[in-house]
Amino acid sequence: MKKENSETKEKKKHKFLKRLLWIGLPILVLIALIVPTNKYIEVPGTTEPVNQMITVDGKKDTGKGNFYLTTVQIAQANLAMIIYSHFNSFSTIYSAEDLMGSMDSAQYDLVNQFYMQTAQNTAVYQAFKQAKMPYELKYDGVYVLDIAKNSTFKNKLQIADTVTEVNGKTFKSSAEMMKYIQSQKVGGDVNIKVTRIDGKDYSFDGKFVKISTGKTGIGISLVDHTEVVSTPKVKIDAGSIGGPSAGMMFTLEIYNQITGKDLRNGREIAGTGTIETDGTIGQIGGVDKKIATASKEGAEIFLVPDSGSKKADDNNYLAAKEAAKKLKTSMKIIPVKTLDDAITYLETGKVND
């Protein structure tokens, strides 16, 4: 009798645990799917035709072939996404600090829009300069992107402020401004004037500090605030896409339109890379994901920055080749260091040394 009672209790216990498992498992799955973590996941984004974003003198490019910019998608990760990333070589997990530094998500998005605006202005400038056509580049100061902990302007400046003067001096470029600042002594007095997003002007006093490079600074991360006036007029509308990495592709599309040249020759050409005021093509993040999305969309050629470094972590070209090998794609990976390199390849098929 005792044995039967014991067996009955075991059966009831087994049934209870089974029910608990069936109830608990969906709850755990739901938690994994909807509860966010403090991590972010980066995965392949989209491949967007640039000719749909740019008008020159009110007209779009209707020629054969396309230039494409490429994006990554970043989202706050849940547990399921983190697990997924361990089995997908084209996804990366970042902490909030690694991704955004001291910024919140709203500030991060705003900064990326400033990067995009600068990329567009520099693209117009470089395309018209390359084509030897009339343009005017206006330097309005520098956008404040981040403020260092040791900056004496930490609780005075705001992200998105435009610094217009330092100690009563105005400048023609951020490089000129930084040269002046670096010539000053750490601990010396400094006054800066800024313009806020609302258009109001402010003046703040502080001290020069030693920054992470060991040089004198005021403790801010910055990007040029510029405007470009060109003839004919160029308009770029990239929607909600942010960041600087479409600079090269914008430049090629604008150059293609204003010169009447056919750089594409009917080809589907994707790429990534910043465009700098001296014509160099700068490194970007997430190049492996951009190779993945471009390959998926059928691009024939991918133009990618080549820093010259022998390490893939420091050279987009090497990282892109590794990604292409994993994907077994037939898409050609073409290294470029300057805008001239990109144009030369598209016109002749030759890669500059």
Residue ranges and their predicted role:
Residues D278-K310:
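Glycine- and Gly-Pro-enriched alpha-helical subdomains that act as flexible
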Residues K129-I159:
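PDZ/PDZ-like groove recognition
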Residues A131, M178-L222, A323-D341, Y345-T348:
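PDZ-domain C-terminal substructure recognizer with occasional recognition of PDZ-binding tails
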Residues F153-M177, A294-S307:
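Conserved PDZ fold ligand-binding element
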Residues M1-F16:
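N-terminal Lys/Arg-rich, disordered targeting/topogenic segments
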Residues R196-E253, N352-D353:
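C-terminal, low-ordered peptide segments at domain boundaries
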Residues D98, S105-T118, I147-N150, T164-N167, ...:
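Second-shell loop/turn segments in exported
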Residues K18-P36:
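Hydrophobic membrane-insertion alpha-helices, especially the h-region
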